[in-house]
């Protein structure tokens, strides 16, 4: 007795050719000196589970999952797992291209990262019989739309704008009070105010005296624990000033 392992193809099909020879050592009118026989035997098909191709994903955006089926009659159930979340992508479908939008709420499980890793599992059915399951890791990124919500209130820390209705060159100091909150579990980590080459940090930030006059642009940047940023841009009017000569 001898065991032989035969590899099946991607459809689970295989065949083998068997042959045998017999030699008697003598011959007569009733007995041949040798015999040989051969034949091809088709082996039972081993059902193959389907495979899944997963692209890079962005939470909240639709993407296409591609299914490769060993048999056109097979159907599939696809589920996902991500942190504390799980759900069904498709239920017993025969489609080979499946649109899926990973929920944006999954970002709650990665408050300190801009990308995360989950698992997609495809279970293959022939009729009502489950043939097997395969799991695939996927990476999904948090979209820029999940950056902090922020507003800013500006004033003149030196008080000149209250008197003159505008900021004053080399006298006024720009003060920015920024109110912000993170989205989907993220926390606000940083605030930066920039104007005319000056910078200041913090939710309440005050620059040095403004060196330029005219319509001057400012930028307030709010960064969260994922590294996502919201940028607030605007302009202020700065009156020219020269010290008496």
Question: Which residues fall in each region the model found?
Answer:
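Aromatic/hydrophobic beta-strand junction motif of beta-rich domains
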Residues: 61-72, 80, 174-182, 245
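Conserved structural position at the C-terminal beta-strand
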Residues: 20-22, 122-126, 222-224
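Surface-exposed, short loops/turns at beta-strand junctions within beta-sandwich domains
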Residues: 3-15, 104-118, 206-215
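Edge beta-strands of extracellular beta-sandwich domains
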Residues: 27-41, 130-141, 229-237
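Short beta-strand segments within Ig-like beta-sandwich modules, predominantly Fibronectin type-III
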Residues: 89-98, 194-204
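Short, solvent-exposed loop/linker segments at the N-terminal edge
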Residues: 53-61, 156-173, 245
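Extracellular interdomain linker/stem segments of modular secreted and single-pass surface proteins
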Residues: 38-50, 139-150, 237-243
